[in-house]
Amino acid sequence: MAGRSGDSDEELLKAVRLIKFLYQSNPPPNPEGTRQARRNRRRRWRERQRQIHSISERILSTYLGRSAEPVPLQLPPLERLTLDCNEDCGTSGTQGVGSPQILVESPTILESGAKE
């Protein structure tokens, strides 16, 4: 892991092994039995998965020293956001999706109070 010290890598690997063990200790439920029994087993399994997920987040935040959730990105106001399609549109297999469109303003739609 680039830019990290070896000791930090060992701590992170230890945390990942622990999380992997937690998930492996909760295998998917057995598909046998009555519908109600299967439903109850799935419900209990999902609850254990949620608990393992929250424990895993706490382990990672402890070992990494930060939250597992990304910090929210501050965006400018919506009025200032624009889509600029002058820079090589459709390079990732989406030809035609990002083609520029011309906005024709209709006074009947934009001016709700005006009647013709």
UniProtKB/Swiss-Prot annotation:
Keywords, sorted A to Z: AIDS, Host cytoplasm, Host nucleus, Host-virus interaction, Methylation, mRNA transport, Phosphoprotein, RNA-binding, Transport
Any one GO CC term of the record: host cell nucleolus
Positions of short motif Nuclear localization signal and RNA-binding (RRE): 34-50
Name of one Pfam family that matches: REV
Modified residues (Phosphoserine): 5, 8, 92, 99
Location of this chain's protein in the cell: Host nucleus, Host nucleolus; Host cytoplasm
Motif (Nuclear export signal and binding to XPO1): 73-84
GO BP: any one term: mRNA transport
Residue segments, region Homomultimerization: 18-26
Modification after translation, per record: Asymmetrically arginine dimethylated at one site by host PRMT6. Methylation impairs the RNA-binding activity and export of viral RNA from the nucleus to the cytoplasm.
Compositional bias (Basic residues): 36-47
Single GO MF annotation: RNA binding
Organism superkingdom: Viruses
Location of the region described as Disordered in the Swiss-Prot/TrEMBL record: 23-49
Annotated HAMAP family: REV_HIV1 (MF_04077)
Subunit description: Homomultimer; when bound to the RRE. Multimeric assembly is essential for activity and may involve XPO1. Binds to human KPNB1, XPO1, TNPO1, RANBP5 and IPO7. Interacts with the viral Integrase. Interacts with human KHDRBS1. Interacts with human NAP1; this interaction decreases Rev multimerization and stimulates its activity. Interacts with human DEAD-box helicases DDX3 and DDX24; these interactions may serve for viral RNA export to the cytoplasm and packaging, respectively.
Family stated for the protein in its record: Belongs to the HIV-1 REV protein family.
Role description: Escorts unspliced or incompletely spliced viral pre-mRNAs (late transcripts) out of the nucleus of infected cells. These pre-mRNAs carry a recognition sequence called Rev responsive element (RRE) located in the env gene, that is not present in fully spliced viral mRNAs (early transcripts). This function is essential since most viral proteins are translated from unspliced or partially spliced pre-mRNAs which cannot exit the nucleus by the pathway used by fully processed cellular mRNAs. Rev itself is translated from a fully spliced mRNA that readily exits the nucleus.
Notes concerning its domains: The RNA-binding motif binds to the RRE, a 240 bp stem-and-loop structure present in incompletely spliced viral pre-mRNAs. This region also contains the NLS which mediates nuclear localization via KPNB1 binding and, when the N-terminal sequence is present, nucleolar targeting. These overlapping functions prevent Rev bound to RRE from undesirable return to the nucleus. When Rev binds the RRE, the NLS becomes masked while the NES remains accessible. The leucine-rich NES mediates binding to human XPO1.
Miscellaneous section: HIV-1 lineages are divided in three main groups, M (for Major), O (for Outlier), and N (for New, or Non-M, Non-O). The vast majority of strains found worldwide belong to the group M. Group O seems to be endemic to and largely confined to Cameroon and neighboring countries in West Central Africa, where these viruses represent a small minority of HIV-1 strains. The group N is represented by a limited number of isolates from Cameroonian persons. The group M is further subdivided in 9 clades or subtypes (A to D, F to H, J and K).
Protein name: Protein Rev
